[in-house]
Amino acid sequence: MIIIFSPAKTLDFAPTHQTLLSSKPVFHKEADYLAALLFALTPDELGELMSISSKLTELNFERFQKWGMKETRKASKQAIFTYHGEAFEGLNAATFNDVELIFAQQHFRILSGLYGILGPLDLIRPHRLEMAVRLKNELGKDLYAFWKGKITKQLKKELKRDIAISEQPILINLASNEYFSSIDTKKLNARIITPVFKEYKDGGYIIVSIYAKRARGMMSRFIIQNGITDPDQLKLFDSEGYYYNDRLSEGDNWLFTRG
């Protein structure tokens, strides 16, 4: 069973001492290629491409200008401890022990516009590149053209080990639509379960983005800390008042509600 997750825009490269365990991104050469494309852009071109403020443009222009420098490589940090946002707050990886981190390394994947797909302990450098950015490259007009085949092939390879413990590989989709769209699901040949989190309001259930992001992190944490490989055990998730709503769930779109 593999969990897929979205990255965050905010990165924290302050040193941490959670673990000495680390790994190299499987698509590190592809990341270098994309970084070289971004290195060649002027600040104005970079800001327009990413639709970001002048302050963020300045920061990210400097990041890609320094991409290949020794000090940049030395400043690399494990992905799971670097990304910061609502989903990663729910995940709270800083409290994981080494056993939990090793389980995460086997079952948890972060999709990335720059790195394609990351294991939690993969070392990453300072960057910003969202999957929806229309960066022209050798394979097409945008990052979906560049990554879809590569990410799908890699996930398919990693999911094959599921066959030993279940009749069909299982993908738990806890990523946003922007990142989930980087996968060719028809070629994956896997059962895809998508947990959806809703709040009760005015007589019905609605998705509140900030809460849904946090809940995706909490669900991932629940899977990792309990070493879950049987998807039916996800229905036991009850963090912060959520519960599995069988009545409103449809197929493999599993609804968790609260309120």
Residue map of PLM features:
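Active-site helix-to-loop segments that bind/position phosphate- or nucleotide-bearing substrates
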Residues: I4-T95
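Internal, well-folded beta-alpha domain core
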Residues: A93-E250, L255-G259
